[in-house]
From Swiss-Prot:
Keywords: Chromosome, Nucleus. It is found in: Nucleus; Chromosome. It comes from Homo sapiens. The nucleosome is a histone octamer containing two molecules each of H2A, H2B, H3 and H4 assembled in one H3-H4 heterotetramer and two H2A-H2B heterodimers. The octamer wraps approximately 147 bp of DNA. Expressed in germline. Predominantly expressed in oocytes. This is Histone H2B.N. GO terms for cellular component: nucleosome; nucleus. The lineage of its organism: Eukaryota, Metazoa, Chordata, Craniata, Vertebrata.
Length: 118
């Protein structure tokens, strides 16, 4: 049996302390990804309306016979316009498309106009 002599070894008196500076609520996530988060503002009616108008202008530049869609979109409240955009997203999902096209927007407006609350 062997005994180990510890007389000559010196242990540090003070333990090493790690100091972590206090970070704010969302800085931990930022430091983990290395990017700053950009907080999105609440979307307004104008954002939905301009986006759908741009899509419809790409598909139908002259709007011959399609101007009722813009009138219908302009007459909607914010929550109704959000409903139409969600319905257009559902239609694009069912058709296995990643982007919302004018066909989905027209279909969503037709579905919404067929209901009595429109």
């Amino acid at each position: 049996m062997y005994f180990i002599c510890l007389n000559d070894l010196r242990f540090p008196k003070n333990k090493t302390e790690l100091y972590f500076p206090v970070k704010k609520k969302h800085e931990w996530a930022n430091s983990a990804t290395g990017k700053k988060r950009r907080w999105r503002k609440k979307r307004r009616k104008e954002a939905y309306f301009s986006y759908m108008g741009k899509i419809l202008k790409q598909i139908h530049p002259d709007f011959s016979g399609r101007s009722w869609v813009l009138y219908a979109l302009g007459a909607l409240n914010a929550w109704q316009l959000e409903w139409v955009s969600l319905e257009a997203f559902r239609l694009s999902f069912y058709n296995h498309r990643r982007a919302i096209t004018g066909r989905e927007i027209l279909g969503a407006v037709k579905q919404r106009s067929s209901q009595k609350s429109f």
